[in-house]
UniProtKB/Swiss-Prot annotation:
PROSITE patterns given in the database record: TROPOMYOSIN
Region named Disordered: 106-134, 186-221
Protein name (record): Tropomyosin
Oligomeric and partner information: Homodimer.
Gene responsible for this protein: TPM
Family per similarity comment: Belongs to the tropomyosin family.
Record-linked Pfam families: Tropomyosin (PF00261)
Organism of this sequence: Branchiostoma belcheri
Lineage per the UniProt record: Eukaryota, Metazoa, Chordata, Cephalochordata, Leptocardii
């Protein structure tokens, strides 16, 4: 009888111990599952952060590309404007040289015309002197008449040359006016190009500043990417460690489940033995 009671007490203790171990195994399994869920959430958060950084890096690279294209376009436009200004300056210089040559020709023509007028005046004075000399011989008179005709011819030639010079002067003045108009237009165009060049230069400086900022921003992004890459590597290491830990925990859970199953089997066996002992006790 004492042996049966002692055996029943042992079976009861074994049953309680089995229940405690089963509860501990279930709690350990729950803790392992919660830890596994937490690690999976951390890995998902890291993946989201990595995708966000990659998107920001793509946007920064696109902005840098656009700024570089605008800078190249502005540089080409400035170079074209400088070339056009240089061409206009050369044309203005050629017009000024042509104007100087026309002025020289005009001065030479006016000087020749002045000489012709002086010769005509001298011939007229000589003719008057000859007319006053009533007693001069006929040969001298004929000579003077011939000189007078020559003087008239010279005067007519001078008048013709004067008209020709005047006509050329009018043409030259027209050419000069047109040249001055072209020069004014060229100066206006040059001023417009200078203003446009200043504006373009300002835009170029602004774009260079933007490109510098974009470069700095890109460097900052690259630094962030390096940091995030390091963090990603660390996270991957942690994830690998977590995966190994999860695998280990899953193995522990499996072991605990096996132990729980064994304890349940043991509990069932103890219960059966206890029931059998109770039946034997009742039969006695």
């Amino acid at each position: 009888m004492d042996a049966i009671k002692k055996k029943m007490l042992m079976l009861k203790n074994d049953k309680e111990n089995a229940l405690d171990r089963a509860e501990q195994a279930e709690q350990a399994m729950k803790d392992a599952q919660e830890k596994n869920v937490k690690l999976e959430d951390e890995i998902n958060d890291l993946n989201k952060k990595i995708r966000m950084v990659e998107d920001e890096l793509d946007k920064a690279q696109e902005s840098l590309k656009e700024a570089t294209e605008q800078l190249e376009a502005a540089t080409k436009k400035a170079a074209d404007a400088e070339a056009e200004v240089a061409s206009l300056n050369r044309r203005i210089q050629l017009v000024e040289e042509e104007l100087d040559r026309a002025q020289e020709r005009l001065n030479s023509t006016v000087e020749k015309l002045t000489d012709s007028e002086k010769a005509a005046d001298e011939s007229e004075r000589a003719r008057k002197v000859l007319e006053n000399r009533q007693g001069a011989d006929e040969d001298k008179m004929e000579l003077l008449d011939m000189q007078l005709r020559e003087a008239k011819m010279i005067a007519e030639e001078a008048d013709r040359k004067y008209e020709e010079v005047a006509r050329k002067l009018v043409i030259t003045e027209g050419d000069l006016e047109r040249a001055e108009e072209r020069a004014d237009l060229a100066e206006t165009k040059a001023r417009e190009l200078e203003d446009e060049l200043k504006t373009t230069t300002g835009q170029l400086k602004s774009m260079e500043a933007q490109a510098t900022k974009a470069s700095e921003k890109e460097e900052a992004y690259e630094e962030q990417v390096r940091d995030l890459s390091a963090k990603l590597k660390e996270a991957e290491t942690r994830a690998e460690f977590a995966e190994r830990t999860v695998a280990k925990l899953e193995k522990n859970v499996d072991d605990l489940e096996d132990a729980l199953y064994a304890e349940k089997e043991k509990y069932r066996g103890v219960s059966e033995e206890l029931d059998q002992a109770l039946n034997e006790l009742h039969n006695m």
